[in-house]
A protein has these predicted regions:
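C-terminal edge-of-domain segments
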Residues: 236-284
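A glycine- and small-residue-enriched flexible loop/hinge signal that marks low-structured segments
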Residues: 1-190, 232-233
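Residue-level marker of positions within ordered structural domains that often coincide
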Residues: 22, 216, 256
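A generic structural signal for short, non-catalytic loop/turn and secondary-structure boundary residues
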Residues: 12, 146, 223, 242-244
Length: 284
């Protein structure tokens, strides 16, 4: 919670997206409500299976839209143990870099530098497959799974996601929310040195046109879809605010959704048997 607060309008300006973890074990004394599927070992309660992770997330309010929640941990070939958030952030930064710094793509289904899932030294869990990983995803938990002949980050959602219960499409995918933050941060970075200059009509139009140009460029590279619109409306800029030197531009746009799943509907037909009868092509 402290990280989320710290990452909200840093220095009064900048938006940041938090990647955090659910624990694989916690001191039993810190648990107020029973965690479904958990087991006690000594003075600790193990959060070492899918059901326990989902229950712990719900009980402890890991549902903020500005964060991505990861579970479990991972271990590499040399025995080093990493938090899921570390592995996810590594993939996220690499993915951003491949897109020229634009957070248009989720780190989900990107390579993870581990050789196994890790649930803590006291756990007997040997791991889970993609089916159970999808159960975690449905609860807004990002995980690590063996898929496509390699270990990969799995889950494109924010912590606010819960299958069938999301009313705000903006918070479904991590890249959607991060794109909104990116656009807001870019606006502030672009015009920071203009603050306290005379706000002429020409400058107002320059800002609007430049932001529209940037929005159209994001469409061109696939970061946004449709036709984003930048506005400067009288209804959003009252005389009282203008007198104070406060000006508001509006942006409306649609981040490109990830290809979360694809289905090919395969049907059988006996129409092909017709080729055995009638004139064959080229027959004389």
């Amino acid at each position: 919670e402290a990280m989320i607060t710290a990452g909200t309008k840093i220095n009064g300006h900048w938006d940041a997206f938090v990647v955090s973890d659910l624990p694989v074990s916690v001191p039993t004394s810190t648990i107020d409500s029973a965690v479904v599927g958990s087991t006690e070992v000594g003075s600790n309660t193990l959060i070492d299976n899918v059901d326990a992770a989902i229950s712990y997330k719900d009980l402890n309010g890991f549902t903020n839209e500005r964060t991505k929640v990861c579970w479990p941990m991972g271990i590499d070939s040399s025995g080093r143990v990493f938090h899921g958030s570390t592995i996810t952030m590594w993939a996220m930064l690499n993915t951003d870099e491949s897109n020229n710094g634009i957070p248009m793509e989720s780190p989900s289904n990107k390579d993870a530098f581990i050789t196994a899932q890790y649930f803590g030294p006291d756990s007997k869990n040997q791991g889970f497959d993609q089916t159970r990983a999808n159960d975690l995803n449905a609860a807004g938990i990002t995980t690590i799974v063996y898929w496509g002949a390699r270990w990969a980050i799995w889950g494109p959602h924010t912590a606010a996601y819960k299958f069938g219960a999301v009313t705000d499409p903006r918070v479904i995918f991590d890249n959607s929310l991060r794109m909104m933050m990116y656009i807001s941060n870019s606006f502030q970075q672009e015009w920071a040195m203009t603050i306290d200059e005379p706000m002429t009509r020409a400058l107002s139009d320059t800002i609007k046109n430049r932001e529209q140009e940037k929005a159209d460029a994001l469409v061109a590279v696939g970061a946004l879809i449709g036709k984003p619109v930048v506005t400067f409306e009288e209804s959003e800029n009252s005389t009282a605010e203008l007198v104070e030197g406060n000006f508001v531009w509006g942006f409306e746009g649609t981040p490109t959704p990830p290809f979360k799943s694809g289905t090919l509907q395969v049907a059988y037909t006996d129409a092909g048997f017709d080729t055995y009868f009638g004139e064959a092509e080229g027959e004389v």
